Amino acid sequence: MDRLLQFRFESAPGWQSNVALFLLSIGGLFTACKLFSFCRALLSIFVLPGQKLSKFGPKGSWALVTGASDGIGKEYSLQLARAGYNILLVSRTTSKLAAVADEIKSKSPTVQTKVFAMDFFKNNDGDYENLKLLIQDLDISILVNNVGRSHSIPTPFVLTPLEELENIIMINCTGTLRITQLVAPGMMQRKRGLILTMASFAGMIPTPLLATYCGSKAFLQYWSIALGAELQPYGVQVELVQSHLVTSAMSKIRRPTVTVPIPRDLVRAVLSKIGRGSGLSAYAYTSVPYWSHGLMAYALTQVLGHMGKFVLGYNKALHESIRKRALRKAEREKNKKST
């Protein structure tokens, strides 16, 4: 018995030491992985350049931009024209498209422009057939899927008008898919091309009171990743561009801040960081090119947990507050009209 007790007493320190070493190794490996991920995000956001646009097509080839009449789409058109690409502008209102085309010609005189007016909500087969005829002889190197629609104000799902639900899904999802299906085959034949699809943090973070909009953007996230894997063997690069708020008609924000850039700065970041994941390097075929958005995406996915109750609760409270302010404003305007 004394020998048995002595054996147990002597073996304990060795057993504890092995467990401690194992736990320290696991902890060290976890810390090293987190540190590597953080450093990679910082390098991608602030230091490393993106791929050159010339990889996807020469100057003089075409870029097709949807939702091109204002905001982010207009800025893509201007900056891609400045880079030497001819621009095919697609949106709903002919007069607005013509104004953007005139601005492009004044700033980039050597660039050609074409305009094509269509209402994505109508999902008219004739519109898509006419657009197909228009692009069949064009060397389209870059497609920017920018057309989009959100809710008029944050609204509980059960109170959202049916027309608004259909509008969001038809424009954000169906329109994007049909345009891409027209353009991608030509890119595959030429063995080069770039497809940029504008997403939103709302598609990455569940957003109460914007449920349908955030669902449509989440759809684009998974669709883009799958499409990217399909088209990569053909030399076509797919990139989903994640962003937080931007000053625009859709966001109804007019004043830029550190986390809310103007469209020009966002687009400049996108075109300079092609192929860089920035704060979302764990997501294939996805980027968050604007620096503050990249840091936010990293914090949300790696620290706070973007699907957790804390972020969900904050998002819900934020949009409930926005809804209350919007309803009060609408009531004030209604009272002004009645007096």
UniProtKB/Swiss-Prot annotation:
NADP(+) binds at residues 64, 105, 119, 127, 146, 213, 217, 246, 248. This is Very-long-chain 3-oxoacyl-CoA reductase. InterPro entries: 3_ketoreductase_fungal, NAD(P)-bd_dom_sf, Sc_DH/Rdtase_CS, SDR_fam. SUPFAM superfamilies: NAD(P)-binding Rossmann-fold domains. The keyword Oxidoreductase applies. The lineage of its organism: Eukaryota, Fungi, Dikarya, Ascomycota, Pezizomycotina. The chain crosses the membrane at residues 19-39. GO terms for biological process: fatty acid elongation; secondary metabolite biosynthetic process. GO terms for cellular component: endoplasmic reticulum membrane.
